């Protein structure tokens, strides 16, 4: 797994670097390549079982979403749909491993964070208002169920999945905030780092 981890980190770094100073082709190549490497890493997991295919499917949906974000603006709606599907598949994966439990502070915190994000970007969303609201809601549910899984069963795989899901939410928070409200110098780096790290930690949970 060490060499696979190094390959994923190198590819992710080259993808982020392309957003600031690299040629356009570098971003087109290394962003999908990073997810393809994660797909290969997930496929080789020693604890791979039937429900693990949901992780593979989630990565494939994210790969499609990434490809669509590289296209012109009119494809953004489809990209949001692909990311929604990815988070839905991850949510089903988390839910399939737990029984009904409820740790009320977690959904409360997530609701506050979701409301804060919507307050920041609401007036700029225009025709994407409801699709993005739905996507944010799905992301919050994903993090909530990953957290509930860890609180219900505090194991290393559950913690890795919870941290991974949380990083995906942070990535979306930064991406949407910078895209619809105000850009800042490190926005692409933070969003991409959290995005790749989030997917990696969810894949890592298959190894623990």
Curated annotation (Swiss-Prot):
Principal subcellular localisation of the protein: membrane
Database matches in InterPro entries: TMEM86B-like (IPR012506)
Membrane topology field: Multi-pass membrane protein
MF GO annotations: hydrolase activity
Keywords attached to this entry: Cell membrane, Membrane, Transmembrane, Transmembrane helix
Family: Belongs to the TMEM86 family.
The name this protein goes by in its record: Uncharacterized membrane protein YhhN
């Amino acid at each position: 797994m060490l060499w696979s981890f190094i390959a994923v980190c190198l590819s992710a770094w080259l993808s982020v670097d392309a957003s600031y100073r690299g040629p356009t082709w570098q971003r087109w190549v290394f962003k999908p390549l990073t997810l393809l490497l994660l797909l290969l890493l997930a496929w080789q997991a020693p604890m791979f079982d039937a429900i693990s295919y949901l992780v593979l499917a989630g990565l494939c949906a994210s790969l499609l979403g990434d490809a669509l974000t590289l296209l012109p603006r009119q494809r953004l709606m489809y990209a949001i749909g692909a990311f929604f599907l990815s988070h839905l598949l991850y949510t089903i994966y988390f839910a399939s491993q737990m029984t009904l439990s409820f740790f009320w502070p977690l959904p409360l915190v997530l609701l506050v964070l979701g409301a804060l994000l919507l307050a920041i970007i609401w007036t700029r969303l225009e025709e994407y208002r409801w699709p993005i609201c739905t996507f944010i809601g799905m992301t919050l549910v994903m993090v909530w169920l990953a957290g509930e899984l860890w609180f219900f069963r505090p194991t290393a795989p559950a913690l890795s999945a919870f941290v991974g899901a949380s990083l995906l939410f942070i990535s979306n928070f930064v991406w949407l905030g910078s895209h619809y409200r105000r850009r800042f110098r490190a926005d692409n780096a933070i969003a991409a780092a959290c995005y790749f790290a989030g997917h990696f930690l969810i894949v890592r949970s298959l190894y623990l």
